[in-house]
Amino acid sequence: AIGEMLLGLNASHMLQYEIPVAGVATDVVGLFNHDNFARSLPETKMVLSAMLQSGKHSAAAYGRWVSSYETTRPVSASAAAQGFTQDIDSMFTVDLQYNYTFDFNSEDDLKLTLGVKNAFDEEVPQVYDAANWSYDPKHHDPRGRMISVGLKLTM
């Protein structure tokens, strides 16, 4: 037998979120919401996971997706010339992790973890409304691919 495999899906899809804008109930789902108190609200976010454990080895992969959304702020001519639009693209990233547990005796062990976040170095979508025309920190991480190594000693 290969081991134990677990598959998972955690998803949310907002159908509607109305707030008062100038006295009128307005649905703000799928918008960046630069001109009201609501935060940016993509319609859908999800995480797909796959984990495999076999003896001292375990591995996991996570696919993270944020749907596209848009800003209602008009794009200036200078911003449009730089390629900005009202659209904020969707983003999909993959995180990978591998663990190996070294057993020293019946009570002590050492776990080695190797990880990669954003394994394919996906760039965040640009947002015209964001500070300095950058990105939306509520839904996107601009740091690119990150590699990690961890050790955990249990005694």
Residue positions per predicted region:
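C-terminal beta-signal and adjacent terminal beta-strands/loops
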Residues: 63-75, 101-155
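Residues that define the transmembrane beta-barrel architecture of outer-membrane proteins
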Residues: 42-46, 90-94, 108, 143-147
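Gram-negative outer-membrane beta-barrel transporters
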Residues: 1-73
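Extracellular loop and loop/strand-boundary signature of outer-membrane beta-barrel proteins
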Residues: 30-37, 80-86, 134-139
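A cross-taxa feature marking solvent-exposed loop/turn segments within ectodomains of secreted
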Residues: 2, 89, 105-107
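Membrane-embedded beta-strands of outer-membrane beta-barrel proteins
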Residues: 48-50, 96-98, 149-151
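Generic long, charged, amphipathic alpha-helical segments
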Residues: 63, 72-97
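Generic marker of residues within folded, mature protein domains
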Residues: 40, 51, 88, 104, ...
